[in-house]
Amino acid sequence: MITQLPDDFRFGGPEMQLCTLAIRIADLAERFGFTLIHYDDDGLGRAASMFVRLESGRALLLTEHAHAVEHLGSKGPVVEVDARDIAEIDVEPFVDEVLEAFQLSRADVDWIAPIDKARALDWIRHWADYFAKRDQAGNAERLK
């Protein structure tokens, strides 16, 4: 079962793009009774998003930009996930989990991220190093 998360949900780790769906986000929201967040995304125009949780507990952020659909050939939302989940199960099984949850097939996928567990782990390490250095620098400033 798939459930909607609050609009203020945030991933615990770094975000990574998993795939792009070839079905409109409004259709998915209507099918599952979810509410979309509509907003202006700085520099990218009008967007619609929703956070959902899969039965496994993994969270997704689906975002669709009107400009991308109207002018760039985008067919549906980008699916972003916590990189730690890709590192755990890899891209292809994760895409399959998303498709099963939304009752979609591979024909409903426009693009799959060309990454693997190792790349996700590298991104997680980079992300963790950045925050450790930032926090360390912040603590040094406070000690002066």
What are these regions (language model features)?
Residues 8-12, 34, 68:
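Catalytic phosphate/metal-binding cores of nucleic-acid and nucleotide-processing enzymes, i.e., regions
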Residues 18-38:
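Amphipathic alpha-helical segments
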Residues 28, 50-52, 60-62, 79-81, ...:
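Hydrophobic beta-strand residues in large extracellular and virion-surface proteins
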Residues 34-65:
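Amphipathic, interaction-prone secondary-structure segments
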Residues 69-144:
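Non-cytosolic coordination micro-motifs
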